[in-house]
Structure formats: C-alpha cells, structure tokens
Amino acid sequence: MATFSGCYTALITPMDRNRQVDYEGLQQLVDFQIKNGVNGLLAVGTTGESPTLDWNEHTKVIEKVHEYSSNRCLTIAGTGSNSTQEAIDGTQHAHDFGVNCVLLVDPYYNGPSSLEIRKEYVEPIALQFPEVQIIPYIIPGRTGTQLYPQDLAVLHKQYPNVRCVKEATGDLKNMELTRQVCGEDFDILSGDDDKTYTMIISPDIAASGVISVVSNVAPRAVVDMVHYCLDGNEEAASVISQALQPLFNIVTVKTQEQTPYGPVACKARNPLAFKTLMNVLGMPSGPCRQPLGKMTRSGLDVVLINTRKIYESNPQILKPVSDYFGVDLKDRL
C-alpha cells in the first residue's frame, strides 16, 4: 500500500458566474498544481464545496480531476457523507473510474459515536473496497463528532487499506495519541495549514505531510516547506512557514459586522476567503454556491492586507501564479 507523504492540495471547485462548475478552469488549476510539484489533489473535499454539489456533479468533478491529472499525481476523492450508503456509492463510482484513494469525513450532524463511526461507517467501506486507500478525516469543529485514536488504531490493525488520517482536530495531544496507538507504519497528514510545520517536526506526532488549502495559491511554497521538514532542514522549513503566515491567517476570516440591532460576529469559513483571493489574483475560481455568499467589505480587506504582506515581503511565494496565469499581481493587489 502507498505511503502518504508531501503536499496534497484540497482543490477548490471553480464556478462560472451562474455558479455552474467551470471545467476548463478546473483543468487549468489541476495543471498549475502538478507543474508546481504537489504530490496529489483532493477532489470535492470541503474546500471543493462538497456540501453544495449534487452527486452527479460530485462524481463528475472527481472524474475530471483524475482525467486531467493523467496519473501525474495521486487523486484523492472526497466521498464521505453522513450516510454510509451514500459514501459507499460515491466510493464505488470513484473506484470504477480508476481512483483508488478516498477521503471519508466523519459523519456530520447526525453525530454517531466514535465506535459507530468505526463499525458502521469506515469499516464497511474498508471491507467492501480492500484495494482502495481509505483516509478518515477528523474535523470535529465542522462535524460535531470524532473518530478517536483508539478506534482509528483498531481500523488500522484490521484493514491494511486504512493507514492514513487527515488530522484537523487542532489538538496536539490527540495527534500524539494517534501516533502512539497507531504505530510508526501509520501516516498522519495535517488538515490545518498553520499546524503543518509543528506536526511534522514533532517526534511525538511525526506527520508526513498536509492536505492543504493554502497550496491552492502557493503550491510551490507549501511543497518546499513540507519537503524541508521531512528532510530535517527545520530552519529552512521554518522560514517558509513564517513567510506563509499571512495566508494561514485567511483560511478563516473573522470580522464584526454591523446590523440595525447591533454588531454581529462574522466568520467567513473556507473556501470563501481563498476563492475570493483567487478571483483577485486572476485564477479560475468564481463564486461560492449558496449558502456561502460574498466576503464583507471588512473581510475582503483582511484578505487583501494579508496577501499584500506576502507580495511585498516574499513575492516569490505568489510568483507561480503570475508565471502560469500570465497576470500582473502588482496591478491586481
């Protein structure tokens, strides 16, 4: 079975002005990512707006990402659901098209226990598709539930195709326990860009890479940071990680907005800020589908201020965008 190592981009799904999938733009984004050295592409994760794509669109985007990549990198299909049968159907379709790796987010809203996630969700899929790599995706802040390390370890011991996790708990102790109970032959991928450096260099976590949002606009920098970490060059990796901090800051953008009845906290969550930034930079992106809307004026200011910091202090980070898409970033920012 494959070892998961490096940078895997959680690809956005570009839309046209009518909020229909822009497949020409998607092909450009796939090529841009591969030419900048990513190890793989996650199609239709949360960043790819899986909640608002119907399953016909969902499976077509997965097919197209796999087709466009032409086996130049790994395709990971986001086939998770809060319905096991739906996840099985999605995994079957991905497998039929030649995709042999899927990401299974913990079932959201209906909130099964960790035991149920193991026995009634991941296990049936791992059993039915032994030749497909299964990556559980642990993100309790979005799902309201969590597959715990102990149940993950049971899955890993019983099923050789469960040998990796996307870890987005934000809890370093949970990550350390995952390493402890799952062993050295289990791969941990960061699901939070701002924690990737720490997760890889920590000997008690020993992550091997990241499924990244930030690499949508800065693939080469994230690729290099991860490779330096894995090669033991922590100083070089730290320099890049610090340089990327302004982009880490905008994965989620928090502002306070005024209403006639007083101020309201506003949290623009991924992928809204990054799709907004990609529009600004001249990359294929388009709008998000409702109920995600538009950045507020103050939210857009946060995106622009942080991106200008990157452009002014470390212009090489965004240079692949200008080189590939032929845009003048100075004019756009």
Which residues does each PLM region occupy?
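Catalytic alpha/beta core domains of metabolic enzymes, predominantly
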Residues: 124-132, 139-256
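Structured C-terminal cap/extension of enzyme domains
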Residues: 200-333
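Active-site glycine- and acidic-residue-rich loops that bind
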Residues: 116, 169-170, 264
